[in-house]
């Protein structure tokens, strides 16, 4: 992807919808957190404003699993109605709390690996009583209801029709992170417009969407149709979107690990871990393939950037290795990723691409502000 700001692009930036999507992946959320810290730093530099935050620049921020937690951290307001966490605060959060969230407690074959109590405790401490409607920009955080067998998407823009989705952010964050076999499912209740109790029985958003890019685009489309701020956009299409999608890495050793001959001998237990990884990798690859194809077909390939490390090895591939050594390794993975080429066909580095993306976000924000002042 090469983000070039042409005169025609600049003229339409004010009418574009900006979307940030963050994948799930447990402790591997440190990788996109590293990218977010770099991007927010670039936005602060471009606009000469140390208080600039990602929520100031994106119309929709979507996340699933650990990506949902990152979404909440950068959109939940503090007492000054600014994001309670800057991007640079996210990695310290993982280092401070990751080892306790993923604290080993023996062998668990018939129950979740972790009890989730510390995770819920820290979410309540950090997010307080904040609800979805208070988010500083539109959010799209996914989960899956095991009772209704349907995905649940928590957003601001649809609360008038579905007020029961105006849940507390800590309930949402625990739910989107409650990966089956790792954490217990989460039950909580809200109220409908009639005052009736509405029950949720939720597990990890990765069950519905490991890569929430398409979900985030759907929310952005509805936002453009219903929000008066986007009245000038008659019919939103991919040419009017800037989409930044952040992955949590895929296992480069996975393809070497299994063969059809070996898998033919597997039973339920042997399939559990590989099947989860296969499903996650396939979902991520297919979303990226689809989006790349569509944006390119519409001559809008400059509007989409997928930042993903496809060469994870060793402990860096694990969902829950929160040892200090592995977390340091994941930070290094994120920092090294910035120096890598966007693709085999595009030798521009992610660092350069993100700098250009930051400039586009800044220009678009200024154009919209100028338009609003008239």
From Swiss-Prot:
Reported tissue expression: Tuber.
Organism: Solanum tuberosum
Short sequence motif GXGXXG: positions: 24-29
Residues bearing carbohydrate: 48, 191, 257
Alphabetic keyword roster: Glycoprotein, Lipid metabolism, Plant defense, Signal, Storage protein, Vacuole
Modified how: N-glycosylated.
Protein name, entry field: Probable inactive patatin-3-Kuras 1
Pfam families for the chain: Patatin
GO cellular component: vacuole
Matches recorded under SUPFAM superfamilies: FabD/lysophospholipase-like
